[in-house]
């Protein structure tokens, strides 16, 4: 039991040291390191709004713009922001993620799956429900639902290829920059300590 306490104390000292060094960075760099997930979340919200617009055009949905637009912006934003914080920002700031390649891979995958593909898949039931409610498009019968949605989604995925790739590259780049800023912060000397 005592060994467990000493490990926690050592880990807490490490987290305190890392946060103290991060606070020594200039404000712009510190903001990028601490709030980078918000930028990825904003890009995901934009992907959600674009996918929503494309599905609305295909399904001829003209009503409930705000009712469909708000969840298509907020849900991808919050999901991407929280996921990026949990799997990239927090492990970087606690010292659990100490490999640049791992950071780039994690942040790129979050950008691709959560920030790019998830908003497009989320737009399908939102706009499908609106099309059924307002009867703006002929929806399939029970037998061919899957083939209908695959056929309907293909042009949307083609048009969303660029925003999804942009989101992936931006997220990977942001992860790389955050890792470099963390390394820069860790190399700063303590203000009260002298190096001999």
Curated annotation (Swiss-Prot):
Membrane side Mitochondrial intermembrane: residue ranges: 56-57, 129-159
Gene Ontology cellular component list: mitochondrial inner membrane; mitochondrion
Main location: mitochondrion
Compartments where found: Mitochondrion inner membrane
One GO BP annotation of this record: mitochondrial respiratory chain complex I assembly
Segments in the Mitochondrial matrix topological domain: 1-34, 79-107, 177-196
Keywords tagged on the record: Membrane, Mitochondrion, Mitochondrion inner membrane, Transmembrane, Transmembrane helix
PANTHER family in the cross-refs: TRANSMEMBRANE PROTEIN 126A (PTHR16296:SF4), UNCHARACTERIZED HYPOTHALAMUS PROTEIN HT007 (PTHR16296)
Family: Belongs to the TMEM126 family.
Function: Protein required for the cotranslational protein quality control in the inner membrane of the mitochondria. Associates with newly synthesized polypeptides and may act as a chaperone that cooperates with OXA1L for the insertion of newly synthesized mitochondrial proteins into the inner membrane. Required for the assembly of the ND4 module of mitochondrial complex I.
Subunit structure: Interacts with OXA1L; promoting cotranslational quality control in mitochondria.
Protein name: Transmembrane protein 126A
